C-alpha cells in the first residue's frame, strides 16, 4: 500500500478545520489539524508533514510568522489560506516563503487539486526532502553558467560566486525555467502554467513575489523585468 501524504492543517475556525480535515482524509490524505500557530509549529516539528496548509489569521503565532519559521527549517511546500484574495497578508505569506495560496471560502475539490499540483511540482515521493519533479523544460544535464551564477541541472544545486545558494523547490523550478531560455521573455501566465502547473488563469502576484525572492538570492540584476511582458534571465 502506498504511503499516505501527510498534511499539516492549521486553522482556528472549528467548523472549517473539522470539515476540511474530513474532506482531505476522504481523499486519501493523512491530516494533522491544529487550531493555532504555536501548536502548528510543534506538530510540524514532531511529524515533518509533506505539505502545510496555514490560515493567515490563526492566533498565537499567525500564519505568516509560522510560514517563516517553517521555511527556516525546511523546504516543505506551504499553501496559505486567506479570506481575501486582495489582502496584503497574501503577499506577506508569499514573501515569507509560501509556495501558493487559496482564497477562503474554498471548494474542497479545488483545494485538493491545488495540493496535488504543488506536490507534483515538488516531485513528492516520500516527504518534504523530495527533490523537484523532472521538468521537460529544464535544460539537459550539466552545469550552466551565467556570470557568477552556476546552475547544476542534475544535482539541482546553485552557486553564486562559488558559494552555495539555498533555493526552495519552487524557486529552483522557476530558475530552471528561466535558464532553459536565457534572454527570452517569459510572461507571468506562461510561468504560472510551467512552474505552478496552472492550467487556468492564476494570480500573477505569485510569480512576482517568487521572482523577487529569487533575485535576492541570485542577484537583483540577474533577472530583468520587461514591463508589460514578463521577465527574462540575462544571457
UniProtKB/Swiss-Prot annotation:
Keywords in alphabetical order: Cytoplasm, DNA-binding, Phosphoprotein, Transcription, Transcription regulation, Two-component regulatory system
Cross-referenced InterPro entries: CheY-like_superfamily, CseB, OmpR/PhoB-type_DNA-bd, Sig_transdc_resp-reg_C-effctor, Sig_transdc_resp-reg_receiver, WalR-like, WH-like_DNA-bd_sf
Record carries keyword Hydrolase: no
A GO cellular component entry from the record: cytosol
Residue numbers of 4-aspartylphosphate PTMs: 55
Domain Response regulatory as annotated: residue spans: 6-119
Keyword Cytoplasm: yes
Post-translational modification: Phosphorylated by CseC.
GO biological process: regulation of DNA-templated transcription
Compartments, as annotated in UniProt: Cytoplasm
Pfam families, sorted: Response_reg (PF00072), Trans_reg_C (PF00486)
Domain of life: Bacteria
DNA-binding region: 141-235
Stored NCBIfam families: resp_reg_CseB
Stated role: Member of the two-component regulatory system CseB/CseC involved in the stability of the cell envelope. CseB activates transcription of RNA polymerase sigma-E factor, in response to changes in the cell envelope.
UniProt protein name: Transcriptional regulatory protein CseB
Organism the protein comes from: Streptomyces avermitilis (strain ATCC 31267 / DSM 46492 / JCM 5070 / NBRC 14893 / NCIMB 12804 / NRRL 8165 / MA-4680)
Amino acid at each position: 500500500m502506498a504511503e499516505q501524504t501527510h498534511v499539516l492543517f492549521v486553522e482556528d475556525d472549528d467548523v472549517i478545520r473539522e470539515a476540511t480535515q474530513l474532506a482531505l482524509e476522504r481523499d486519501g490524505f493523512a491530516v494533522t489539524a491544529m487550531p493555532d500557530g504555536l501548536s502548528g509549529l510543534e506538530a510540524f516539528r514532531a511529524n515533518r508533514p509533506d505539505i502545510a496548509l496555514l490560515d493567515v489569521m490563526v492566533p498565537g503565532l499567525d500564519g505568516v510568522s509560522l510560514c517563516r519559521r517553517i521555511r527556516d527549517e525546511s523546504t516543505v511546500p506551504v499553501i496559505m489560506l486567506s479570506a481575501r484574495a486582495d489582502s496584503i497578508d497574501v503577499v506577506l505569506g508569499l514573501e515569507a516563503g509560501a509556495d501558493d495560496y487559496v482564497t477562503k471560502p474554498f471548494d474542497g475539490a479545488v483545494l485538493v487539486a491545488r495540493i496535488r499540483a504543488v506536490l507534483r511540482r515538488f516531485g513528492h515521493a516520500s516527504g518534504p526532502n523530495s527533490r523537484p519533479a523532472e521538468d521537460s523544460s529544464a535544460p539537459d544535464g550539466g552545469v550552466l553558467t551565467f556570470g557568477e551564477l552556476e546552475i547544476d541541472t542534475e544535482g539541482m544545486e546553485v552557486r553564486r560566486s562559488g558559494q552555495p545558494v539555498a533555493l526552495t523547490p519552487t524557486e529552483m523550478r522557476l530558475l530552471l525555467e528561466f535558464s532553459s531560455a536565457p534572454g527570452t521573455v517569459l510572461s507571468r501566465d506562461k510561468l504560472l502554467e510551467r512552474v505552478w502547473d496552472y492550467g487556468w488563469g492564476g494570480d500573477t502576484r505569485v510569480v512576482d513575489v517568487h521572482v523577487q525572492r529569487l533575485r535576492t538570492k541570485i542577484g537583483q540584476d540577474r533577472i530583468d523585468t520587461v514591463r508589460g511582458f514578463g521577465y527574462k534571465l540575462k544571457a
